[in-house]
Amino acid sequence: MADTTVAKLAEEVGKSADRLVEQFSEAGIKKSKTDTVSEDEKQKLLEFLKKQHGGDSAPTKMTLQRKSISTLSVSGSGGQSKDIKVEVRKKRTFVKRDVAAEAEAEAKAKAEAEAKAAAEAEAKAKADAEAKAKAEAEAAAKAKAKAEAEAKAKKAAEGKPAAEETAEEKAAKVEEARLLAAKEAAAKAKADEEAKAAAEEARRLAEENEKRWAEEERLRKESENSADHHVTTSTEARAAEDSADRDAERRGRRARKPAGGKKEPIGKKRGGKEARGGRNNRNQRNAPESMDHGFNKPAAAVTRDVTIGETVTVAELAQKMAVKATEIIKQMMKMGSMVTINQVLDQETAQLVAEEMGHKVVLTRENELEHQVLADRDGNVKVEPRAPVVTIMGHVDHGKTSLLDYIRRAKVASGEAGGITQHIGAYHVETDNGMITFLDTPGHAAFTAMRARGAKATDIVVLVVAADDGVMPQTIEAIQHAKAGGVPLIVAVNKIDKPEADPDRVKSELSQHGVMSEDWGGNNMFVHVSAKSGEGIDELLEGILLEAEVLELKAVREGMAAGVVVESKLDKGRGPVATILVQEGTLKQGDIVLCGLEYGKVRAMKDENGKSITEAGPSIPVEILGLSGVPSAGDEATVVRDERKAREVALYRQGKFRDVKLARQQKSKLENMFANMTEGEVQELNIVLKADVQGSLEAISDSLNKLSTDEVKVNIIASGVGGLTETDATLAAASNAIMVGFNVRADAQARKTIESESVDLRYYSVIYHLIDEVKAAMGGMLAPEFKQEIIGLAEVRDVFKSPKIGAIAGCMVTEGTIKRSAPIRVLRDNVVIFEGELESLRRFKDDVNEVRNGMECGIGVKNYNDVKVGDQIEVFETVEIARTL
C-alpha cells in the first residue's frame, strides 16, 4: 500500500494537520505536514491514542432492550370484540467470554498459591523441627561439658578419694551419653513425622484442586459444545425458568387440578372451556390456549445437503441453507469478498461458502440432461479409414467452382446467380484412387462466417489462386482460416493457360503470408491447374489423396451418427431442409436427430444430386428433411435414442439462447442510453430481409450491419429463410421498412398487402447489387453538407456619402462577379470585420444585378457605414453538397 502524507491523513480522519503532528510527537514520532506516514507508524499512533484514552479496555458487558407492541382482539360484553395493545419488553445482557475465562484463571492461580503456601509451611515445619533437635543436642553437650568440668574440679580438691570413685563416674557418663542419644533420636523422629504429615496434607490438597479443575473444565466444554449455548444467558434462563414455575404454581393454586391429575394448559378452565370473563373471573384476561411455544432450538448444528447449480444468487443460497442472507454476506466478508444480496455467485464460490458454514454440497449442471443424451451412444470403437473432406477456398472469381465443376463433370458455376457461389456446396467425388468429399465455399467478402465453417469441418484446404491476379484479400483470409484450424494447405494455381499467367509471382506473394512452396523448402504443395483445359487436375487429386494418406483419417463407421450442418434452408414444399456432413457413424432414415436448437426424425434423405438414399456414412454430405425448424449453419447434428429427451434438450437450448439474447439487448440498451441522448436522433433504415438459405442470410445481415454509421443505422427488424409472406409485408408497412428478398419471392397474399400499403419491395440474386443499393439508400438519408464558394472580390478605391444610403464604396471588381442577391463579407487586412448583404449595386448611376471582373461599381452595404479605402468586399454563395457513404 502506498504511504500517505501527514496532511492527507489528517484530511481523511477529519483533524487539523497541526494537531496530528502534535499527536505524532507525543507518541515519540517526529513528523512534519509533508512527511509520509507508513502503516507501522499509523499503528504505533493508534496504540498510543488507545492507551491515552483508555481504548484498550473494551466494554465487557452489553445490555439490549427490545420493545414490541402487538394487538390482541378480545371479546367484550354483548358479543362485541375490541382490540387492546400488548407491549412486550425484553432485556438481554451479553458478557464477553473473556470475563469467564479470567475468573477461571483467577481461581486456578488462587489454588496454585494455596498449594505453594502449603508446601512452604511443610518446609518451614521441617526446618523448625531440625533446629529444635539441634538446639537440644547442643544444650546436652554443654551440660556434659559442665559436668566434666565440675568433676575435674572436685577431683583436684579431693585428690585420692576421687581416684576411688572413677568406676562409678565412668558408668554415669555412659548412661548420660545413652540418654542423650535416645533424646536426639526421638526429636529427629518427631520432626520427620511432622514433615511427612505436612507433605501428605499438601499432596491431598493438590489432588483435590486438580480434580475440581478437571470437573470445571469438563463442564465448560460440555456447555460450549451444546448448540446455541451462551455464557451470558444461562443465568437468565435459569431465573426465567424459576419465575415461570412460580407463576404456574400460583395459577395452579387458584384453578385446582382435575381428578385425573392431568395438568391443564394455562388459560383453560375445568372441562376444557375457555375463560369467558364471567362473575368469578371478571377481571381475568382471555389467555391463549397454551403459553408454550411450538418451536424448540435444535440441540446441535443442522447439516443440510445444499444443491448448487452453475450460478446462484446470495438470496437463493441463503434460502437453500435456511439461514439469513446477512450470514452469507458476513461469511464472504471474512473470506475477503464484498457481495450484495442479489449478486450472482459462480458454482465454486458458492461451494466454498456452503462448506465453510458446515453444509454438504451437491453440485448440479443445468444441462445435465443434454450431457446424458449426448453421452448415451453406442460403445462401438472400431474405426475404419474414411474419405478426406476437402474445402476449396480462395478469392472471388478465381475459379474455385469451375475447378470443382471440371472435377464433377457438371455445370455448377453457370447455375449460380452472377456466376459466383453464394452457398456452401457439398459434393463427393469417386476417383480411381478413392473417394473425396469437396466443400465449395463463397469467395465474396460477405461470406467470412461460411468460410470459417468450411475450414472447421474440413481435413484439407485447397487454396485456389488465379495466376493472372495473384494474392487478394479473401486469399489471405482463407490462409488465416486454415492456420487457425490447423489444416494442411494445398495451393492450386489456376488459370495457368492464360498468356498473362505468372505462377512465380503467386509463389512470391504467398511466401509473404507464411505459405512456402516445397520447391523453396516449405511444406505446402503447389499444383498448376487449369479449370478450362483440365491441365493439372489429376496431379491435384493425387496430391489431395497423398496428403490424406499422411493424415491417416479414420472414423467409426457403424453406430449412431454425428456430423455438422453445412447449410440449411426453408423449402416451401418440403419444410426445413438441412445439409449435413456426416463425420462419424451412419445416418439412417428414421433416426432421431438433435441439431442445435432444433430436433426431429429423419423423414427423407437425399444426396447432392437430389437422389433419395436411406443411409450415409462418414464424410458423406446429405440433405435431411423432418426437423422442427431451420438449424443454424455450423450447428452440430447428433443422433439420439429418445425423441422426448431430444425435444427437452432443444427447448432448453432455445430458452438459454433467448435469455442470452435478451440479456445482450438489455446491456446494449443500457450502454447506449446516454450516447443516444447526447447524439440526438439517428436516421434508421428499416429492412425486412428474407433469403433462400441460412448461410446467405447470415452473410447479408452481417454486411448490412457493417454499413451502419453514426448518422444512419441499418435496422434489420425481421429476417428469415424462405419466401416473403403476408406477415412480413404487414410488418414492413407498420415499421416503414424496405422488403428485401434474396433469391426468394413474395406469395400472392403478400403481393396484395405490398400493393395496398405501397411497401418498397426489392428482389436480388447477387449480393453485390443488394449491398450497393442499400448503401445508396443510406446515402440519400444522410444530412447534406453546405459549402461556401467565393464568387467575386471587389477592392474599395474611394468612399462617397449618400444622403439616402450612407457610405457608398467605389470599388473595382478584381475577381469573379459581384451579385446583388448574394451575401458579402467586408475584409480589412484580410480579417473579416463585417458579414451581411448588399443594399445597393450601381454602375454609372444605374442599378444593376451583377458587375463582372475588371469593371467599376458603387456598393452600398446594408447597416454598415465604416467602409474605408483599401477594404475588400467578398461576395459568396452557399452550395449544398449531397453526401455519400
Curated annotation (Swiss-Prot):
Comp. bias regions, Basic and acidic residues: 99-178, 185-231, 238-250, 261-277
GO cellular component, one term: cytosol
Region (G5): 530-532
Record region (Disordered): 99-295
tr-type G domain sequence ranges: 385-554
Region of interest (G1), residue spans: 394-401
GO MF entries: GTP binding; GTPase activity; guanosine tetraphosphate binding; translation initiation factor activity
Binding site for GTP: 394-401, 440-444, 494-497
Compartment(s) of residence: Cytoplasm
Amino acid composition bias (Basic residues), ranges on this chain: 251-260
Record keywords, A-Z: Cytoplasm, GTP-binding, Initiation factor, Nucleotide-binding, Protein biosynthesis
Region span, G3: 440-443
Role played: One of the essential components for the initiation of protein synthesis. Protects formylmethionyl-tRNA from spontaneous hydrolysis and promotes its binding to the 30S ribosomal subunits. Also involved in the hydrolysis of GTP during the formation of the 70S ribosomal complex.
HAMAP family noted in UniProt: IF_2_B
Similarity section: Belongs to the TRAFAC class translation factor GTPase superfamily. Classic translation factor GTPase family. IF-2 subfamily.
Protein name: Translation initiation factor IF-2
Organism: Shewanella loihica (strain ATCC BAA-1088 / PV-4)
Gene name of the record: infB
